[in-house]
């Protein structure tokens, strides 16, 4: 895999608060190699290492995108939801930003059935068929459609399990992470100082609580994916 330059700037990461970890009492000892200091009771992440692993992640997603691979971005906590949706839409990725439904990947046949139902209901709404049903039936189906839109709207065009999954918060998305591990799907995630860096294929040491940090990391990954997709379009 060819290494590329992704304009990862340490000062920019500091301004975004990427280096701020959790309180020193809430840390995972496995993160010791990625911590450079303690300041006012919190751990400080070594941004040089962050830059290294973020660059590796960008290389990986560029290479995958240039070969037409599919990505899923997962981040369901309120702070991350908008950034996840923005990043996914920009890079034409699938995303989950409301709630991870258990078995979404490991029980793909059930997810596929739900997606078929979702598409059918969307078509019925688009054609006006729902409005021609009795009010009670129409109301029930509209509630069902709204629920499916909330939880599956970001994966409505997904036709199979993704090739790479990007996860914003290890603890919040642990079920999604375990499903990826079970299926052998490569994962990239932000690794705060209270996380286990050994569970992902590429762990990016970074603050997974600050919106500015999440947005910066996703922005770099999304740029690499877009560049890779452009390469794929030029050289199919």
From Swiss-Prot:
GO terms for cellular component: chloroplast; mitochondrial small ribosomal subunit. InterPro entries: Ribosomal_uS2 (IPR001865), Ribosomal_uS2_bac/mit/plastid (IPR005706), Ribosomal_uS2_CS (IPR018130), Ribosomal_uS2_flav_dom_sf (IPR023591). GO terms for biological process: translation. It comes from the Eukaryota. One of its GO terms (molecular function) is structural constituent of ribosome. CDD domains: RPS2 (cd01425). The keyword Ribosomal protein applies. It holds the Pfam family Ribosomal_S2. The keyword S-adenosyl-L-methionine does not apply. Coiled coil: none annotated. Keywords: Chloroplast, Plastid, Ribonucleoprotein, Ribosomal protein. It is found in: Plastid, Chloroplast. Transmembrane segments: none annotated. HAMAP family: Ribosomal_uS2_B. Belongs to the universal ribosomal protein uS2 family. This is Small ribosomal subunit protein uS2c. It comes from Nicotiana tomentosiformis. The gene is rps2.
